[in-house]
């Protein structure tokens, strides 16, 4: 931190002559004469020696100087002049290699101010909102460096977003609240936040920040953005994260269903750390080794996850699970009125998971006999046929629908494709007559 940080702006003014570089920068600024005069007086008071010493803490000191020493009511033009001088200095430095290294936007133990970003074209996008709190990022707070890296990585991703300015501002505010929450609650890693901590964050927003549900949801989006950004930008896949993003798992196309809306695998709902760790190990094996279709793996995991959540609520380690506990769980899911086929899917999922636990040495044997609990499935036929009269009526009014809906209906009616398959068709899959 520069020497001026230890000085107080009310100290007795010393006889100090500003360097020519600083005087020229102030004189070249397009502002009122009295504004330039106040800047020179303040810089002389703090003994500014180089424009590189201009940063956000000094800007705040200048704000206090204007407010409490000069008793000015409208300080906006004066702060704008300060910012313009700093921004002009950054633009000049970015023309040289040494200057780019000096002004590079990087994570340091200091306060970062977005209008002083090394990419001044990007910084000027926030020029009209530079007075807002979400422009200031204090990385001097007592928090683990790893957490600061995650916040800084997400901050850069949000700054590069191409969305509307209002939405980007909401993301910045949400990320700032998340950073503050993590510091206050000693959270060292965004990727290990579980469901309980997520609820605590919602309560934090409810009690201190956001007054309505929609505001909470908008600010909560920052947590998902941070999780996704960090997970995708990690040099290697972080298998210890509580939320995995499918696009980072590098799965071949033949294992993915293009029509599936599944984008994440979540472990945060499993409250017991040991059970959560076993679930991650199981899914890492399924995704990385088995070669099965991802949809099959994810569906099975949903059944296993439900069981592990129930066990964790009982504060029971899955390795010490007994047959009586499994029977209690099966009785519980039967109360939901599930079909015999779905019940057998639960049995098959538990069997698959316990075989994995035995094969990897976490258990000596499977704690129940799956075949004993399986039910007889009676196939059912669902008549989904459409009468010819209805088909003719739809075809007669088809011209009233938009082109994409007409194409979808004709595919379903003529070709027999599934709805999910039709939804995956793209524009370049069609041949247009005479084109």
Whereabouts are the PLM-identified features?
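Charge-rich, intrinsically disordered N-terminal extensions
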Residues: 1-360, 397-400, 410
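Long, charged, glycine-rich C-terminal linkers/tails
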Residues: 322-326, 366-375
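Basic, Lys/Arg- and aromatic-enriched nucleic-acid-binding interface segment
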Residues: 389-419
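Short, flexible/disordered secondary-structure transition segments
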Residues: 340, 361-365, 405
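Short, basic/aromatic-rich helical patch in the C-terminal catalytic core of site-specific tyrosine
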Residues: 422
């Amino acid at each position: 931190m520069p020497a001026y940080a230890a000085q107080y702006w009310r100290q007795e003014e010393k006889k100090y002559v500003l360097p020519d570089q600083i005087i020229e920068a102030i004189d070249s600024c397009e502002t009122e004469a009295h504004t330039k005069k106040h800047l020179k007086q303040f810089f002389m008071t703090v003994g500014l020696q180089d424009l590189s010493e201009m940063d956000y803490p000094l800007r705040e000191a200048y704000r206090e100087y204007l407010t409490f020493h000069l008793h000015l009511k409208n300080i906006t033009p004066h702060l704008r002049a300060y910012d313009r001088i700093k921004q002009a200095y950054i633009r000049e430095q970015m023309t040289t290699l040494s200057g780019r290294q000096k002004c590079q936007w990087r994570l340091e133990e200091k306060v970062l101010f977005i209008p002083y970003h090394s990419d001044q074209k990007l910084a000027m996008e926030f020029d009209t909102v530079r007075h807002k709190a979400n422009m200031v990022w204090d990385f001097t707070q007592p928090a683990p460096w790893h957490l600061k890296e995650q916040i800084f990585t997400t901050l850069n991703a949000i700054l590069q977003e191409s969305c509307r300015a209002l939405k980007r501002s909401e993301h910045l505010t949400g990320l700032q609240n998340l950073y503050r929450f993590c510091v206050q609650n000693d959270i060292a890693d965004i990727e290990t936040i579980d469901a309980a901590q997520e609820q605590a964050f919602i309560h934090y927003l409810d009690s201190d920040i956001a007054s309505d549900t929609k505001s909470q949801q908008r600010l909560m989006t920052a947590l998902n953005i941070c999780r996704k950004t960090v997970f995708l930008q990690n040099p290697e896949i972080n298998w210890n994260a509580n939320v995995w993003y499918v696009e980072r798992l590098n799965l071949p196309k033949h294992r993915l269903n293009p029509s599936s809306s599944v984008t994440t695998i979540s472990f945060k709902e499993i409250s017991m750390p040991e059970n959560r760790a076993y679930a991650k190990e199981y899914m890492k094996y399924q995704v990385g080794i088995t070669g099965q279709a991802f949809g099959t793996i994810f569906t099975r995991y949903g059944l296993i996850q439900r069981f592990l959540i129930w066990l964790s609520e009982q504060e029971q380690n899955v390795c010490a699970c007994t047959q009586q506990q499994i029977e209690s769980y099966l009785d519980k899911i039967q109360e939901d009125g599930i079909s015999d086929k779905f019940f057998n899917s639960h049995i098959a999922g538990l069997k698959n998971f316990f075989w994995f636990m035995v094969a990897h040495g976490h258990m000596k044997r499977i704690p129940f006999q799956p075949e004993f609990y399986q039910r007889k499935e009676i196939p059912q036929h669902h008549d989904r046929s459409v009468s010819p009269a209805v088909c003719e009526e739809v075809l007669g009014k088809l011209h009233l629908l938009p082109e994409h809906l007409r194409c979808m209906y004709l595919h379903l009616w003529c070709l027999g494709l599934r709805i999910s398959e039709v939804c995956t068709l793209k524009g370049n899959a069609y041949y247009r007559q005479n084109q």
